[in-house]
UniProtKB/Swiss-Prot annotation:
Coiled-coil features, chain-numbered ranges: none
Pfam families: Mur_ligase, Mur_ligase_C, Mur_ligase_M
Purpose: Cell wall formation.
PANTHER family for the chain: UDP-N-ACETYLMURAMATE--L-ALANINE LIGASE, UDP-N-ACETYLMURAMATE--L-ALANINE LIGASE-RELATED
Phylogenetic classification of the source organism: Bacteria, Pseudomonadati, Campylobacterota, Epsilonproteobacteria, Campylobacterales
Binding site for ATP: 108-114
GO cellular component, one term: cytoplasm
InterPro entries for the chain: Mur-like_cat_sf (IPR036565), Mur_ligase_C (IPR004101), Mur_ligase_C_dom_sf (IPR036615), Mur_ligase_cen (IPR013221), Mur_ligase_N (IPR000713), MurCDEF_pg_biosynth (IPR050061), UDP-N-AcMur_Ala_ligase_MurC (IPR005758)
Protein name as it appears in the record: UDP-N-acetylmuramate--L-alanine ligase
EC numbers, comma separated: 6.3.2.8
BP terms from Gene Ontology: cell division; cell wall organization; peptidoglycan biosynthetic process; regulation of cell shape
Main location: cytoplasm
GO molecular function: ATP binding; UDP-N-acetylmuramate-L-alanine ligase activity
Organism: Campylobacter jejuni subsp. jejuni serotype O:6 (strain 81116 / NCTC 11828)
Length: 431
């Protein structure tokens, strides 16, 4: 049995790969800088996890796979190289992991986790590797003895080009992670074209500015024409979106917002290649959402607290639109957004867009930037967000939130945005 060690195993994407290979019969170990919910869960699943990194952790290993966050000076990476152990980045390891599978890969700047998750609910015989926790299964990985595998493909480091898709879905091709592409949008778009070209079946959002010009044969969704009568409702505080798709009738999906209808439509059009429409309509009801995507942590008649992974203006704007609809349906009079900016480079590149995205909220609270390893960039955020409340920290007290300056947030709809620590802050109760 091959011994595989993962450096940075606590990451949402790389932990899914570790889980998948463990199910395939490999002996898995891993390490990370600090303990987390994911590392604790992995240990319960029988994975030996070492905290922090130490060179001895890679002794007697046949292969080392490391996350994108790992630098060359990492003691385990350095020692593995010295010992001649084969080292692969997550990106380089994908062909090895996916080699014998029929891959249904979902890419795009926004909506890929949701679209992947919905597709996984529809294709219930497929294994799943995604960068989010499916509430239906309580994991970012599902292993099935099947040739089919639903995979969330990442364009940020061009690793989606290593996914060898049988079916490829692209939700949109908005410019994100341009630093990896030499700040040239044309290189990013060329990568998307390569990703699509490899696939036998292609499903695209044909109203995306780039994708609408894609030349090869594909199944095209024109959201403004194909999605009709999109309505939202709340049932026992749970959000649902209903819509009609082309001439296929009505569908109902867990979650709130037009973007949910769009993501679900792409998954439905993909699944139609393998399933009949009534099976799809029924299985769509199994989908229960994903963690950190309009994730309702507490709800009663006076207060609803929501955690959302949104960290780009486009995502935030779409989710706030859904939040406004939820507040209207639920009778919540005030909307408070708590924003933890993720990466200085993203914040600096999209300052005006972020300001615009938050225009509809009654109160905006801004936490310090989650740097994700980046060097700080000097930004005058108070000039861009003159009405915002800037706080050093926020913590959960029972069902309420308390800011470091003493402010208490206890009514209306409160929604947190960010890809850093904010989710933990919103979830860690101090009773």
């Amino acid at each position: 049995m091959q011994n595989i060690h993962f450096i940075g195993i606590g990451g949402i994407g790389i932990s899914a790969l570790a889980r998948f290979l463990k199910e395939k019969g490999f002996k898995i170990s891993g390490s990370d800088l600090k303990e987390s919910k994911i590392t604790k869960e992995l240990e319960k699943e029988g994975v030996k996890v070492s905290i922090p990194h130490h060179k001895d952790n890679i002794l007697n290993k046949d292969l080392v796979i490391y996350s994108a966050a790992i630098k060359e000076e990492n003691p385990e990476f350095k020692h593995a190289k010295e010992l001649g152990i084969k080292c692969l980045s997550r990106k380089e390891a994908l062909p090895l992991i996916l080699e014998d599978k029929r891959v249904f890969a979902v890419a795009g700047a926004h909506g890929k986790s949701t679209t992947s998750s919905i597709l996984a609910s529809l294709l219930d015989d497929a294994s799943v590797i995604i960068g989010a926790i499916l509430k239906e299964f309580g994991s970012n990985m599902i292993y099935k003895e099947s040739q089919n595998l639903v995979f969330e493909a990442d364009e940020s480091d061009s690793s989606f080009l290593n996914s060898n898709p049988y079916l490829a879905i692209v939700t949109n091709a908005e410019a994100e992670h341009l630093d990896h592409y030499g700040n040239e949008v044309s290189k990013l778009h060329h990568a998307y074209t390569q990703f699509l070209d490899v696939a036998k079946i292609r499903v695209i959002n044909a109203e995306d500015e780039f994708l609408k010009n894609y030349k090869n044969e594909s199944i095209k969704l024109y959201p403004s024409k194909d999605i009709k009568n999109c309505t939202m409702c709340i049932e026992n505080f749970k959000p649902f979106t209903s819509f009609e798709l082309k001439d296929l009738g009505e569908f109902k999906v867990f979650g709130m917002g037009y973007h949910l209808a769009l993501d679900a439509s792409l998954a439905i059009l993909a699944a139609l290649n393998f399933l009949d429409i009534e099976t799809i309509r029924t299985r769509l009801k199994n989908y229960q959402g994903i963690k950190k995507r309009f994730d309702i942590l507490h709800a009663d008649e006076n207060l609803v607290l929501i955690d959302d992974y949104g960290h780009h203006p486009t995502e935030i704007k779409a989710t706030l639109s859904a939040a406004q609809e939820y507040a209207k349906l639920g009778g919540y009079k005030k909307i408070t957004a708590i924003f933890e900016p993720h990466r200085y480079t993203r914040l600096a590149a999209n300052l005006k867009e972020f300001a615009k995205a938050f225009e509809g909220v009654d109160e905006l609270v801004i936490l310090p930037v989650y740097a994700a390893g980046e060097e700080p960039i000097e930004l005058d955020l108070k000039a861009v967000f003159p009405k915002a409340l800037f706080v050093e920290d926020i913590k959960r007290e029972g069902k309420f939130l308390v800011a470091s300056k003493g402010q208490v947030f206890e009514e209306g709809l409160i929604i947190g945005f960010g890809a850093g620590d904010i989710s933990n802050k919103l979830r860690q109760k101090n009773e």
